[in-house]
Amino acid sequence: MADPHRRRPPLQVVREGNPGKAPVREGVRLPPSPLVEPNWLDTFPTVADLDQRETNTRCREIARREWRRVVPVLTLSAGLAAVDTQTVQDYCICVARIDQCERDLSTRGMVIQGERGWMKNGSTTIAGQYRQQLARYIGELGLSPSARGRLTPPEDNQDEDDNVFD
């Protein structure tokens, strides 16, 4: 049986109605501001080792592509502010590192030859840890259907006269 004193999520209140006119808890709203894309060369530097250099080049490209894919969407749906830059940057790094681990698993396999025989490829553990962190970022940023239901989109500053439904 459901606890009658438990708060309902704001979206559920909207869907089911609010007959008791209980206040709907809203979070702190920051004014939206443009996010500046980080210099991915700082995170994935050019190194002397050719294999690592290629890996870092690919990670830079993956992170850059993910940033450019999600920031415009998040700006509209979640109203990102400058304080959110680090969270989005970490999200993009997770995506790039998961790609790096998956490529390693595809080329070297799940089990590799070690000093003492066959052992699990370390990329399997690392990929799992990054996936757990990525799931947290997806929830924080509202990048999944269930997480989007918990977000309130930023209000547009439109005049009431400009309403297309009038």
Region roles according to the model:
Residues 1-65, 149-166:
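Arg/Lys-rich, low-complexity, intrinsically disordered N-terminal tails that contact nucleic acids
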Residues 2-18, 91-101, 105-156:
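Amphipathic alpha-helical protein-protein interaction segments
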